[in-house]
């Protein structure tokens, strides 16, 4: 799959990021991960991102990363394209990117670099180096320390033909509008704020109809129903699902930093696809929070 073909795929439909399965000892659970991917693939996501933020990329050892990407690529070879999360320092990100390409990933999501303070010119140089290290398509993720501006993205687009996507995790509407207007159809645009469904209607109005769903990990039918309601501008259905599920869900998620990942793993366990504990420094939901989430999921019915 060439970068332009990937761009076309990412320009429509729902995307998701499977959690990474760990056993009770905290080691990668390959069998559980395969089972998860086989469950999720038929629901109709346009692409799945292995070892992304929700997949706890930041906590993985290099050897685990290779096994996770290979498992995802092999399991989903005939069903859904797999993109791989990459990040860290520039040299680390290049190593991950080249390994993911070697293992057959169709593209990459370039996560924000390590927490070193840097100018955005330096961040752009980091992105350029990673893009030029591979031939597959790359989506850059503007979030936290990565705040690339429209002029910098335009420069990167000229220098890196395989940079085909922009994912927004900042929620800076002025910046998003400037990027969307200036770059036009050069990129595919993905909404990437935590619990992106809450912002989906607003982002669609900005020309960003595609987003990544974390809750697809445990209520995939509801996630797809919500996406289709957004696509057809069924405001009544969108409002009902936000009121009945997403707002109470946010009340739980917002209790602690890092719960955006922890709550998804809890949801997967409730759905019958236990992915094990999160890795430190993240913490799992408390027993009370888990039961609150279970009651909320139960109201969504069979998936």
UniProtKB/Swiss-Prot annotation:
One of its GO terms (biological process) is D-glucarate catabolic process. CDD domains: KDGDH. Keywords: Lyase. It catalyses: 5-dehydro-4-deoxy-D-glucarate + H(+) = 2,5-dioxopentanoate + CO2 + H2O. It holds the Pfam family DHDPS. It is an enzyme of class 4 (lyase). GO terms for molecular function: 4-hydroxy-tetrahydrodipicolinate synthase activity; 5-dehydro-4-deoxyglucarate dehydratase activity. Pathway: Carbohydrate acid metabolism; D-glucarate degradation; 2,5-dioxopentanoate from D-glucarate: step 2/2. InterPro entries: Aldolase_TIM, DapA-like, Dehydro-deoxyglucarate_dehyd. SUPFAM superfamilies: Aldolase. SMART domains: DHDPS. Its EC number is 4.2.1.41. Belongs to the DapA family. This is Probable 5-dehydro-4-deoxyglucarate dehydratase.
């Amino acid at each position: 799959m060439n970068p332009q073909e990937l761009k076309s795929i990412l320009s429509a439909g729902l995307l998701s990021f499977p959690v990474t399965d760990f056993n009770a000892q905290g080691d990668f659970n390959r069998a559980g991960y395969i089972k998860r991917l086989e469950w999720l693939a038929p629901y109709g996501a346009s692409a799945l991102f292995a070892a992304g933020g929700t997949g706890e990329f930041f906590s993985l050892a290099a050897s685990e990363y290779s096994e996770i990407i290979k498992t995802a690529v092999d399991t989903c070879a005939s069903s859904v394209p797999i993109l791989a999360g990459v990040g860290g320092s520039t040299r680390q990100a290049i190593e991950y990117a080249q390994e993911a390409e070697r293992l057959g990933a169709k593209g990459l999501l370039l996560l924000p670099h390590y927490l070193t303070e840097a100018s955005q010119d330096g961040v752009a140089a980091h992105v350029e180096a990673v893009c030029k290290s591979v031939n597959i398509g790359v989506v850059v993720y503007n979030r936290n320390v990565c705040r690339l501006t429209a002029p910098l993205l335009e420069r990167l687009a000229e220098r890196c033909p395989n940079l085909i996507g922009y994912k927004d995790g900042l929620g800076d509407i002025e910046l998003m509008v400037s990027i969307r207007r200036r770059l036009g159809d050069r990129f595919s645009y993905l909404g990437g704020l935590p619990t992106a469904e809450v912002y989906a209607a607003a982002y669609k109005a900005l020309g960003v109809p595609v987003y990544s769903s974390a809750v697809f990990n445990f209520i995939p039918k509801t996630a797809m129903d919500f996406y289709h309601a957004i696509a057809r501008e069924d405001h009544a259905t969108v409002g009902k699902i936000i009121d009945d599920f997403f707002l109470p869900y946010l009340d739980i998620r917002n209790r602690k930093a890092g719960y955006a990942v922890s709550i998804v793993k809890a949801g997967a366990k409730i759905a019958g696809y236990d992915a094990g504990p999160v890795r430190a420094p993240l913490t799992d939901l408390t027993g009370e929070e888990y039961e609150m989430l279970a009651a909320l999921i139960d109201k969504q019915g069979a998936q």
